[in-house]
Amino acid sequence: LLPGDTPSVSDRRRLIKVTAHELAHIWFGDYVTMRWWDDLWLNETFADWLGDKIAEQVYPDLGVAASELGAVDRVMTSDARPSAVAIRLVDAAPEAALQTVGVAYNKGKAVLAMVEGWMGAEAYQRGVLDYVARHAWGNAAGDDLWSALARAADLPVADTLRSFIEQPGLPLVVAEPLGGNRIRLTQRRYATAGVEVAAERWRIPVRLRAGGAGKVVERALLLDRESTELALEGLDSIDWLLPNAGPSGYYRWRLPARELEQLAAVAPDHLSAFERYNLLANAAALLASGDLGADGYLALLGRIAVDPDPAVLDGVLDRLETIRTPLAREGRVAGWPEFLRTTLRPPLERIGRAPRPGESAQA
């Protein structure tokens, strides 16, 4: 099915993902079928979620999970537009429901992954198996899925999923240290600078990681109000804070400038490659929304450009253009070529210009 004798990694990955996705429709589409067109997202979202898990387990060298980081970031960018639509349009006509299929793939999959992380993998799997067993060779709606997941975990899954599935856009979670081990979390709708969007409220499964005095703790919570304060038990003080550990959540996040610098400084030791990628992607989103200045973004870009992980470096290259417009506004484009040479020469010299024997497919 692939042209030539040496297909590219991206072509191989695309073929495997599509094949696994279509096989997953045996369960989500054939074995259990949507009741009406407004739940078309159930078929496509679940098939993509399960298909990616299959592809990652069978072909770990193709970097399926790493490639999804970029896909989720791109759908977040689209979801920030005023024209964004909800994944599920209740009682929609077939023509209207079909318009949401595009966002259903990546946003829907990211939301399901967030809920899976919140519930725990075992509880989530029990809920999905319950859903499939109850509606085998029959029809089901979104409410049936939410009820099955809620039974498996005794959590407010229905209201949480509705807040992401039945309204457009995505939240921005602002994390502010208050001194000692206390922080404040506030949510609002994320939007790019100068764009007016309707206010929305979400029920957000948030996973935090923080470090202080040589100790590291994680805390999971549901942010179901505009703002809340909490203490990170196990720490006396906070040296650094990661507002989206995993990254597990479908949300943008913001730290004060000083705390963002502290997080970037400890990223090589305390953040996974996926979390470092998210740190960069999130910074680009903050640049677009006006929540991060050009200097702060350039400093972060320079730090992450020395990252050893190929997926993170690929993210750096993808986001080099995001800074050109802010620099042009400030009349600083003349220094851009030198920044590129200084930033990209070390990783280029380390990686080389040609594949090395035994090098992974992703590299």
Residue ranges and their predicted role:
Residues 3-7, 34, 94-101, 132-133, ...:
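Short beta-alpha connecting loops at secondary-structure transitions
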Residues 2-3, 33-37, 49, 94-96, ...:
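Flexible loop/turn segments at secondary-structure boundaries
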Residues 24, 62, 77, 87-90, ...:
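Non-catalytic accessory/interaction domains
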Residues 3-69, 128-129:
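Zinc-dependent metallopeptidase catalytic helix centered on the HExxH motif
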Residues 49, 118, 164:
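Conserved catalytic core of Hanks-type protein kinase domains
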Residues 12-14, 44-110, 114, 260:
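Acidic/His/Gly-enriched intrinsically disordered linker/tail segments
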Residues 1, 30-32, 91-93, 109, ...:
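Short, histidine-centered active-site or binding-site loop motifs used for metal coordination
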